Amino acid sequence: MLLSKKTSIKVSREYANLIGHMCYAASKLWNVCNYERQHYKETGMEQYPDWYYQKKAHKEELWYKQLPSQTAQEVCKLLDKAWKSFYALKRSGGIETPRPPRFKQESIPITYMQMGIVHERDTDRVRLSLPKTLKKYMEETYQIHENFLYLENKIFRGMDQIKQLRIYPPEKGNCKIIVVYEIPDQEELPQNGHELSIDLGLHNLMTCYDSGNGKTFILGRKYLALERYFHKEIARVQAQWYGQQSGKGVKYLATSKHIRKLYKRKHDSVTDYLHKVTRYLAEYCREQGITCVVAGDIRNIRREKDLGHRTNQKFHSLPYNGIYIMLEYKLKRYGIRFIKQEESYTSQCSPLSPKVEKRYAEPSKRKERGLYRDGNRTYNADAVGAYNILRKYHSVSGVKRELSVTGLKTPEIIKVAV
């Protein structure tokens, strides 16, 4: 199984120069190959320049030779993926006039593949190869005499097989890196009938039902607060900045470094919080002996729906696919099965109904956002959704199992540190 870790390391002036030059060369190689794809007919080429053609045709050119061979090939490969995505979008009609991949105005990250990385087990240092052309240029121009690039960080210590190392352009002596490494696959645990179901939402990010003890609990209440804080802060700064530009008569309003930093902080804060929430859930499943997690599949739930500009903003920013990915790989490390279950009518059917399907759906019983009333019985609406998701999974998979409804009234709210 492949995992990744992201961190930032300090680099010397010489290393920053080396990395910066390779990132610059990567952007120029991208632009050369991109121009070739956009204008291959005008340049008199007989066939469309795909990845296989470009990685051979540019092998002896300046920008290609300034990069390790596999790194240069990876730049061409990423461009190839971008063009394939463009053509697929054009065929599907998802966007009326999709634009082709753009030219890079700034340096771009570079990717070292496994062949260019040397790492001794249980050490915190990796050695990266440098191309001969780059070493010669650096010696003549900057008097930098480096045969290899050495990076040190404690995250390398626990890694046996590093598959990729993605390096971003240095900023103020720091360099962000993403390490992709491989760990042995964990064998899936035998199913013991102990399951957990998850209902994803906005106010309650994850409402969970434990089939073993009938317990329900809510995770991720701080997600919406984080989103709201950053949206308000970004709007405040944008209003000030755009007002200043308008007062000076600027015709085309531009963004600012402050606004870009706020967007980055928002992305990092939300991603960090989702990792903490999903890690808590994975640890809970491991401790309780749960062998299967069933999550409601809400993909395409936003399609062709207009719920008002405020709800639309919340709904469209919900990173449900990222949550699925985080849950799947964290649970896989413990051998726990992860399943996405279609969840139609799960929030409208009573937990006491014979089945979860359209004929038993009664939307009128959901009195308020968090209240479901069935006769004299009241339940938490999100807990009912999580409970019915598990019932629907049992129905689809042909499993007959009694589930308790005693914990659906008052779910426990679990607070995870932000």
Over which residues does each language-model region extend?
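Gly/serine-rich nucleotide phosphate-binding loop at the start of the catalytic core
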Residues: 1-74
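Short amphipathic alpha-helical coiled-coil/interface segments
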Residues: 26, 75-83, 259-266
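Broad gene-expression machinery/nucleic-acid interaction feature
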Residues: 4-6, 112, 123-129, 162, ...
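Stable alpha-helical structural segments in soluble proteins, enriched in small hydrophobic residues
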Residues: 33, 74-86, 383-393
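Long, hydrophobic, amphipathic alpha-helical segments used as structural scaffolds
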Residues: 34-37, 41, 83, 87-94, ...
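Positively charged, helix-rich recognition surfaces that bind polyanionic ligands
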Residues: 3, 17, 171-418
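Acidic carboxylate diad motif detector
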Residues: 49-170, 313, 317
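Beta-strand secondary-structure signal
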Residues: 8, 78, 127, 176-178, ...
